[in-house]
A protein has these predicted regions:
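A short alpha-helix-loop-beta-strand transition element characteristic
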Residues: 93-95, 143-154, 177-182
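Rossmann-like dinucleotide-binding cores of NAD(P)H-dependent redox enzymes
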Residues: 1-55, 124-130, 138-172
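Flexible, glycine-rich terminal cap/loop adjacent to redox cofactors
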Residues: 158-276
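Conserved beta-strand-loop-beta-strand element in the redox core of flavoprotein oxidoreductases
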Residues: 51-67, 73
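FAD-site-proximal beta/loop scaffold in flavoenzymes
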Residues: 68-142
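Short acidic-glycine loop/turn motifs at beta-strand connectors
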Residues: 53-54, 96, 208-210
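Residues forming the flavin
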Residues: 2-3, 8-20, 59, 68-69, ...
């Protein structure tokens, strides 16, 4: 946003990837999008010092790659769960992430205490915290034993175009199953061409035996909207065939999900619209 207002922006990332826990293809595409916008992106940066510039003007960030000067600095270090409540006195244990340990029903090591949201030390998502809260209310009041389906929880990064994803990455899925994956460029999606925003891609990971969908990750126009269909697909344990057999409105960005599903069986790059 600042870059589009004419401000020089530099992004310094400690990791070798811009989005380290996302698919590498998505991370590389996101970096390319930012660089196209004129954002200066540097990976593998170790910040050694931050000091005021000469004559008290601006700031200087000293890194292993050199110095960067800027009028304003935003330091994004993540969030830590607020657990400084002497929880051990209540028999509440912490997990390896420093958050509160819970079971699938969000019950802590003290069976009379539940925990939800950012305090768990997992994904920091408002929608996830809300769902955990409502499920906990049902579990405590009616003993319904409901669980959060973490596999179908989507996420998004609101760059333009959006990065979004749901389910397992290829690296995660390959440790558990025999899998196949496909990548479709947004330049092969009719709606993307119409909008003039063909940057991006969609990647799908599936079981190589029964074709169940394990993960969908994308970067593209309205990606944060498109990923919700993928979340429902994972929630319902659907297969590639289910997506292929579902009629999608043409032209839409959501059609990219059907196209990447079809790409497991055919070359969709030169296919006429709406063909199954």
């Amino acid at each position: 946003m600042y870059r589009r207002l004419g401000v020089e922006v530099a992004l310094l990332q400690r990791s070798p990837l811009l989005l380290p826990d996302w698919e590498p293809e998505i991370s590389l595409e996101a970096r390319g999008v930012l660089e196209e916008e004129g954002v200066h992106v540097a990976m593998g940066v170790q910040v050694k010092e931050v000091r005021k510039g000469g004559d008290g003007g601006g700031n200087v960030v000293v890194t292993n790659l050199g110095e960067v000067e800027g009028d304003e600095i935003l330091v994004v270090t993540g969030r830590r769960p607020n657990v400084d409540l002497n929880l051990t006195a209540a028999g509440v244990e912490l997990n390896e992430r420093g958050g509160i340990r819970v079971d699938e029903e969000l019950r802590t090591s003290n069976p009379d205490i539940y925990a939800v949201g950012d305090v768990l030390g997992g994904r920091i998502l408002e929608a996830l915290a809300e769902k955990q809260g409502s499920i906990t209310a049902e579990n405590t009041l009616s003993n319904s034993h409901r669980k959060v389906d973490m596999l179908s929880v989507p996420r998004s990064v609101f760059i333009q175009p959006n990065a979004a994803g749901v389910g397992l990455t290829e690296a995660e899925a390959s440790k558990l199953y025999y899998i196949k994956s496909r990548v479709l460029r947004m330049e092969d999606v009719a709606k993307a061409k119409i909008l003039g925003e063909t940057r991006g891609l969609v990647k799908m990971i599936v079981d190589s035996g029964n074709w169940r969908i394990f993960g969908v990750h994308l970067i593209g126009e309205n990606g944060a909207e498109v990923v919700n269909e993928a979340a429902l697909a994972l929630r319902l344990r659907t297969t590639v065939y289910d997506l292929v057999d579902t009629v999608h409105v043409f032209p839409t960005m959501a059609e990219s999900l059907k196209l990447v599903a079809q790409s497991f069986f055919r070359d969709v790059r030169n296919m006429s619209c709406c063909v199954d």
